[in-house]
């Protein structure tokens, strides 16, 4: 019996000696996983984030009936009863996220490059592959609504990054989409010139004219058919932002705000003085 007990004790101690390091290793791994979290350098793709937003929006719309009714939800239900034709905000949000997800997939699949090569064919004669002006003017109106939506989405997405990484043909198309033929220019027409209007614009095939460039030019001959294409661009100067040019209602609001600010400042200063007087009296009595 004594020998058997000794063997059992040795066997148990041997097992404990073998299990002890295993427990320490497992505990060490748990501590490492608990307190050490490696930083992932890989950023999740935009399409995955959009899918997550769509799923959260749909889950929020389905579980909103289970949550307690809030004040905003009650007001939205009241307005929906009063205005049945008003659009649903949740549906608009979900449809907008689905649209962004679809445009992201189209942009990642290289559809924008296919459109640019199909309609504009950037010339390889230039160093930075610029689009020929005549091709740009002729083929840009041929873009469909889906193509323009993809172009606008690409502009909004790529403008957030480094502009030095953008290609010149994309910048040229972005510029034309934003500003048109004339671009953000202020002085283009000579005031003392007598030739026809199109020659003053360097003989470029413009189809619309900037009204600001022509308002001081008395020698410019504009045909009646071209008047419909005139774009009115108002030039803002310092004279517009004067006290005399402000309407009476705005003056009254500004004066009221200034009066209230002065009244609050005087009231706070008076309260501060009344608080300081007892402190001064206590110091005098103590002396």
Curated annotation (Swiss-Prot):
The keyword Mitochondrion applies. The keyword Transmembrane helix applies. It is a single-pass membrane protein. The chain crosses the membrane at residues 250-266. Residues 1-24 form a transit peptide. It is found in: Mitochondrion membrane. Keywords: Membrane, Mitochondrion, Transit peptide, Transmembrane, Transmembrane helix. GO terms for cellular component: mitochondrial membrane. Its main location: mitochondrion. Involved in respiratory growth and required for cell survival in the absence of prohibitins or GEM1. Belongs to the GEP7 family. This is Genetic interactor of prohibitin 7, mitochondrial. It comes from Saccharomyces cerevisiae (strain JAY291).
